[in-house]
């Protein structure tokens, strides 16, 4: 499910009115990687499987982002997809795409 209408538009329609997402929607490599990540998230049966996919750099977040998790979008991308894991399976509530703090 989506907690962000602009993110939903980007993922489902490849377009958005949000400044960052609009810029990203024009990047073909990013959109390819985003679609690949979304396919992986839909295909795993439990969150623990994401640890096995090293290229995603899956991590539960800490400190002020505690309660959220993230995966990297693409191998060399500075962007990550943040989400909330739900109890009872792989139901994921997508929150946003952000620049990873360690990549400049």
Regions picked out by a protein language model, each given a short descriptive name:
Residues 62, 66-104:
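Enriched for short, Lys/Arg-rich terminal
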Residues 12, 46, 88:
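Residue-level marker of positions within ordered structural domains that often coincide
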Residues 43-71:
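A short, surface-exposed loop/turn module that caps and links secondary-structure elements
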Residues 12-17, 24-25, 52, 64-66, ...:
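Short, charged helix-to-loop "capping" segments that act as catalytic/coupling loops
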Residues 1-39:
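Arg/Lys-rich, positively charged N-terminal/basic patches that mediate binding to nucleic acids
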């Amino acid at each position: 499910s989506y907690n962000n209408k602009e993110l939903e538009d980007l993922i489902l329609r490849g377009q958005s009115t949000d400044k960052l997402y609009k810029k990203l929607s024009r990047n073909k490599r990013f959109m390819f990687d985003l679609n690949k990540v979304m396919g992986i998230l839909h295909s795993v049966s439990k969150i623990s499987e994401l640890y096995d996919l090293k290229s995603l750099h899956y991590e539960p977040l800490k400190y002020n982002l505690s309660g959220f998790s993230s995966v990297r979008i693409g191998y060399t991308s500075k962007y990550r997809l943040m989400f909330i894991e739900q109890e009872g399976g792989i139901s994921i509530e997508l929150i946003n795409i952000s620049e990873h703090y360690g990549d400049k």
